[in-house]
Amino acid sequence: MIKPDGVSGNYTEEIKTIVVEAGFNIVKEMLTQLDKETASAFYEEHSSRSFFPHLVTYMTSGPVLVMVLEKRNAVSDWRDLIGPTDAEKAKISHPHSIRALCGKNSQKNCVHGSDSTSSAEREIKFFFKDVVSGDIATQQHDEL
């Protein structure tokens, strides 16, 4: 997912180019504006954390581009491509990562990345109801 700062900062096409050049296929994409209820549900696992209200406010501050990416080892390769959560640290340790390119800090870090294959499956289904479990589980690659 390209977060509001990535979309409003006009990084969308640049990020998509990086994604494709890294060997991913963009299977589905959807530009959407999250409301408070949707953002809260998507990030529900963080609801008890102190940063949760700020996260929901940020994620509803502008449109996001949700993508389904496909590639063998997609989740781990995507995590490598986006870099560390904190964009300031990414600029030092992973200067060619997406977060180093367009992120500002640990929240405004331009992109979201699933942390596991099971999270990827849940997150894909959250936004793309037409994707069924077998579509993901039986593929010869991961999707996120």
Swiss-Prot record:
GO terms under biological process: CTP biosynthetic process; GTP biosynthetic process; UTP biosynthetic process
Residues the entry annotates as binding ATP: K3, F51, R79, T85, R99, N109
Gene3D superfamilies, sorted: Nucleoside diphosphate kinase-like domain
Catalysed reactions listed for this entry: a 2'-deoxyribonucleoside 5'-diphosphate + ATP = a 2'-deoxyribonucleoside 5'-triphosphate + ADP; a ribonucleoside 5'-diphosphate + ATP = a ribonucleoside 5'-triphosphate + ADP
Keyword ATP-binding listed: yes
UniProt key word Mitochondrion: no
Keywords: ATP-binding, Kinase, Nucleotide-binding, Transferase
Residues annotated as the enzyme's active site: H112 (pros-phosphohistidine intermediate)
PROSITE patterns to which the protein is assigned, alphabetical: NDPK_LIKE (PS51374)
GO molecular function, one term: nucleoside diphosphate kinase activity
Enzyme Commission identifier(s): 2.7.4.6
Similarity-based family: Belongs to the NDK family.
Function, as annotated: Involved in the synthesis of nucleoside triphosphates other than ATP. The ATP gamma phosphate is transferred to the NDP beta phosphate via a ping-pong mechanism, using a phosphorylated active-site intermediate.
Name of protein: Probable nucleoside diphosphate kinase 5
